[in-house]
UniProtKB/Swiss-Prot annotation:
PROSITE patterns with a match to the protein in the record: HSP90
Protein name: Chaperone protein HtpG
Localisation per UniProt entry: Cytoplasm
Keyword annotations of the record: ATP-binding, Chaperone, Cytoplasm, Nucleotide-binding, Stress response
Region (A): 1-341
Pfam families to which the protein is assigned, alphabetical: HATPase_c_3, HSP90
Protein's job: Molecular chaperone. Has ATPase activity.
Lineage top rank: taxon: Bacteria
Assembly and interaction partners: Homodimer.
Amino acid sequence: MEKREFKAESKRLLDIVINSIYTNREIFLRELISNASDAIDKVYYKTLGDSSLTFNKDDYYIKIKPNKEERTLTISDKGIGMTEKELDENLGVIAKSGSLQFKKENEIKDGFDIIGQFGVGFYSGFLVADKITVITKAFGADKAYKWESDGVDGYTISEAEKDSFGTDIILHLKANDEDENYDEFLEEYKLKSLIKKYSDFIRYPIKLDVTKSRVKEGTENEHEEYVEEETVNSMVPLWRRNKNELTDDDYNNFYVEKRFGFDKPLRHMHISVDGMISYNSILYIPENIPYDYYTKEYEKGLELYSNGVLIMEKCSELLPDYFGFVKGIVDSQDLSLNISREMLQHDRQLSRIAKNIKTKIKNELESMMKNDRESYEKFYKSFGRQLKYGVYDDFGMNKDELKDLLMFYSSKEKKMVSLAEYVERMAEDQKYIYYAVGESNERIEKMPQTEMVLDKGYEILYFTEDVDEFAIKMLMNYKEKEFKSVSSGDLGIESEEENKKENEENKGIFEAMKEALGEKISAVKASSRLKNYPVCLSSEGEVSIEMEKILSAMPNNQGVKAQKVLEVNTNHEVFNSLKDALENDKDKFNLYTKLLYNQALLVEGLSIENPVDFTNDICKLMK
């Protein structure tokens, strides 16, 4: 029996296969089952071109046989088998794909699904085995052959005995060590779990002898174990079935079976695409937030399949972060079964699929907002924050993609409205989209800064989440209408002449108030927005008061401060008390000014810088 060397570069390639392409040992079974499925496919294709041959699918299956005594695992198929020449060419040259060659020689169109076209899957067996034996008999041949190798010193090919065509791959498992327990791949539960995980949708039955228990004949309570051959895989992927044959229950049951969630999904999408890219997909939009969704532990991603064989449990490259809540699967014939996570990042087909999926999700959400508002509001309550993060993230790169999906509570409608709905009903003389920021709708409704805007009959959007104002600052405008905080210095509705006159007339008292407060504020001015309140705070520049609150609460904050302006209602009776105090008692004037400033801080939800001084000032006032 002649010892043959692997072809040139094959030793180096074998090392790459074992140590680089495959980073997870357990996928060896997936690879060998996929090869077995391909081998049966080839028999089927042969029969299509020869009327004298028949193909009865019930006769074809894949058998997994563990042997604990000999520490071997055998994967058998009734596939096309290999001749001596094919053994030498296909298994003697690493990264040569017999399936790809078969497609070329038989001019098979891409519609014929053969899983393995990369040519390295067989060698994944060396992840768990220190020797592999292959016994094979080619379809229509008289002789069988045995190929054997330890993966290091080449291989041997010799004649063998085999009754029917097909292939047996016998893995002689490595010895256990401190890091790996290879015996687990001989355990029934482990083999079943790997088949269900990676190869559940292989189109031929995968059979395994399973130990079961039953009541022993002639007894009532005595049990005995027996072995029964069982088909482990379900074979038909839901996503490849006709949509018209499926019910909501089918989709909901699949959602639970795949453990995407334990409640009913809010929406499902069944996608089939053929053209520049080809893939099938079932996607789900959950109704409720996963308990860990807004934590570092949460992993986004879709299950990724190649021809029904699982490549990756969570392929994050298929979803942008702002759609990270979507669950589901993607199956494509255009992806290599052996693709690694590193290779995925540069895979053009995957990028095209991801782009298409992103568009499908956006269209589904837009349709839900338009045609099923109640469901969309449920979704938005759970995941609206994620969309707003998407607007703000990456320097606003995705803001145009997401702006039409945003919703905020409306002062006028008393419910959630979209930006498009707000703009459609804006008054002709209204320059801006007005918003107010606060901890809750109730707090915002009591804000003194809203009085003037509401008196004009203008609608205000309520921002109650930390990310809201950051997202809107990044968005800047919507349909050419700029956003304006009700707390900003210029609302665009005040009379400039009246403001100028008011500030000139009270210049002295405002300068005295500024002097009393020092660097706490950048200016004091007359307010045209206040009716019932004596003072309020507004801001100038890009950083609002609410943004300062959020930034200051963050770890390692940089001490970013808003440029605060104290606005004074000159028509309020308190203002008369201020003027009297300035003329008659400067200390009392300073006391009043500080109290009013602290009052404005409290109304704004800001903390008082020195609570002890504040309480002492109140006591002085009461004397």
